[in-house]
Amino acid sequence: MLGKVYIPCAGTARIEGSIGSLIAISLGIDQEATGRENIYIRGSLLGLKKQEIEQKIGQIIELCDLGSFIDLPIRTYSTGMQMRLAFAVSTMIRPDILIMDEWLSVGDESFRSKAESRMVDLVNNAQILIIASHSKELIKNTCNRVIWLEHGKIKMDGTPEDVLTAYFG
């Protein structure tokens, strides 16, 4: 609902601010299009205008480190290359509200450190982070408020320390 994929069954949802989601980061990738073309395709699906994509394309290409492969069809990429491109494009957004399902960690060891730095920057620049996670460390390190949901209902709302203690025992 927060990602505007579903509408409420009852009541209304009022969301103030831009929303970005890091769920399904490969959504919209066209296997026949080049990496460069996919940057524009995926960027537009993320709500970016062509001019915004053009301002960020150099940064995206540098992050995904695909070299001349950027102008080849995605179908010629390894799975790791596809994930690096999808990650680089998906993390070019700067939303007020960031929705994540766990922490993204993609690629080989050298890319992982760049990806980690990008994720920290993205999370730090969001006004609100909504993350679904069972990782005690991740929640402790990124959240200042935790809401424990059970069967769609709020079971507990409080500080990370209080909620994590109740959840994990």
Give the ranges of each region predicted by the language model.
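H-loop/switch region of ABC-family ATPase nucleotide-binding domains
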Residues: 133-134
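Helical segment within the ABC ATPase nucleotide-binding domain
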Residues: 112-125
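A short, surface-exposed alpha-helical micro-motif characterized by mixed small hydrophobic
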Residues: 139-141
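A short, proline-enriched helix->beta-strand linker immediately N-terminal to the Walker B motif
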Residues: 91-100
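ABC ATPase nucleotide-binding domain signature region
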Residues: 1-43
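Conserved ABC ATPase "signature" C-loop
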Residues: 151-152, 167
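Conserved ABC ATPase "signature" region
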Residues: 40, 52-69
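ABC ATPase "signature
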Residues: 157-158
